[in-house]
A protein has these predicted regions:
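ABC ATPase NBD coupling module
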Residues: 55, 67-88, 92, 113-116, ...
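Conserved ABC ATPase signature
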Residues: 137-141, 145
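ABC ATPase C-loop
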Residues: 154-155
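Helical segment within the ABC ATPase nucleotide-binding domain
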Residues: 177-191
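Helix-to-loop junction immediately C-terminal to a conserved catalytic motif
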Residues: 51
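The feature captures the beta-strand-to-loop junction immediately N-terminal to the Walker
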Residues: 36-38
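ABC-type ATPase nucleotide-binding domains, specifically the catalytic core motifs of the NBD
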Residues: 15, 33, 71, 96-118, ...
Length: 241
């Protein structure tokens, strides 16, 4: 299968403090890849670097044949990259509808507004609570609804490659389970590739096709999600169970 994303020799950090070291990654269309590891391993830094929020010091990021190094966030969004950060980034002063419309601001031309309207309608079909609260402001929503809104805003961009950082953080178990199940539905329906950082290792591996384990900024293991789940030594050494 042709790879959607290819990452080679990626190094990144903050100022003089390196975090990622020679990270290689391959993602195929229609797959979910879980990024696993302890706090401080470099998982969020990896997502920030791929989305364009952090400039790497070395390496290559190739999306469908296009090198993303040096491209700003907005350009990456236009090419099909969407990022749902930890903390969700919902703007509390804006309504649900206004937050969703932000996901389509990059579109230009006569049909841009119509295309965004159609994408927003599709999000409301996926997330009925948002449809019922489209006039509510972000600060009026529950944690689960804010996560739906953050994910929905990313989907308005119709991404090829979705980066998700801790989507279940702070959510009730039943809400977190529904969000995770939806990721599989989205993968199957859209064919997009998902890179998932998730604190709940069991939940992440349950929905993922592949997994990579990161320790001290390096990929120390990779493979099928079921194989990682079954590797007792790996679990004890890096995953805490």
């Amino acid at each position: 299968m042709t790879e959607l994303l290819e990452v080679e020799g990626l190094c990144a950090g903050y100022g003089a403090a390196p975090v990622l070291h020679d990270v290689d990654l391959r993602l195929a269309p229609g797959t979910i890849t879980a990024v696993l590891g302890a706090n401080g391993a470099g998982k969020t830094t990896l997502l920030r670097t791929l989305s364009g929020l952090l400039r790497p010091s070395a390496g290559r990021i190739d999306l469908t044949g296009r090198d993303l190094i040096g491209l700003p966030v907005e350009r990456r969004v236009m090419l099909g990259v969407a990022h749902v950060p930890e903390g969700r980034g919902v703007i509390g002063e804006l309504t649900v509808q206004e937050n969703l419309r932000l996901g389509g601001l990059w579109r230009k031309g006569a049909g841009a507004r119509r295309e965004t309207d159609v994408a927003i309608a599709e999000v409301y079909d996926l997330f009925e609570p948002l449809a019922r609260r489209r006039g509510y402001h972000g600060h009026q929503l529950s944690g689960g609804e804010r996560q739906m809104l953050a994910l929905g805003r990313a989907l308005v961009a119709r991404p090829k490659f979705l980066l998700l950082d801790e989507p279940s953080l702070g959510l009730a178990p039943v809400v977190a389970a529904s969000i995770m199940a939806l990721l599989r539905t989205l993968r199957d329906a859209s064919g997009m590739a998902v890179l998932l950082v998730e604190q709940n290792v069991h939940s992440a591996l349950a929905i993922a096709d592949e997994g990579v384990v990161v320790s001290l900024g390096r990929v120390v293991a990779r493979g099928k999600a079921a194989d990682l789940q079954a590797d007792e030594g790996l679990r004890h050494a890096y995953l805490g169970f």
